[in-house]
Amino acid sequence: MSYRVALLIVVVTHLVGAVGLRTDFAQWMVLLTPVHLLVSFGLLFSFSSKSEFLKGALLAVFALGLLVEIIGVNSGYPFGSYVYLEGLGPKVLNTPWLIGVNWVMLTLASGSFAAQFLDNGSRLQRALLASGLMLVLDVLIEPVAHAHRLWIFAGGIAPWQNYLSWFIVALTAQWIVGKGLESNRLAGPILLAQAAFFALSWLWPIAF
């Protein structure tokens, strides 16, 4: 697939989601969240290096993300007390397995962008930048996820420990994949599309 076609798919899917969630079809659009996540990851990965190291590292990030989320959902640590509803599909120990894919996609996108932006930077500098980008996305995502009924925190709002723990786990994930990351032409557009999609929800409420 050409870069232009992939970029068009990224833009169109995010636009359709942004508009659709503000119509009478909002609840149906939420059901497409898993499909959108898998499509975005598939496109992003198709423009990655696909080295054996990177494949193994991404698998490790999947396991890390899913394990931490399973622990979090069932113990309230380290993210706080929260539960996943049905929007992200089938679950493993009360946790959607797709949340592991989400960790992989965000790690790959932000890490690849950092590798390009800090071309001569150290592994630590890249990891810190990428983790910071992931934290910014989480800040944007949390209230939208609550509105989508994807997951809900006790009290209706994510506690400060969620963001601290998110950054620590993100930094760990970035360190795991650090050696295998290269510039990815689709990383920037996907990060920008996601940031715009979630930021829009702060200005234009979802139709629920």
Per-region residue spans from a language model:
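Aromatic-rich, lipid-facing transmembrane alpha helices and their immediate juxtamembrane interface loops
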Residues: M1-F208
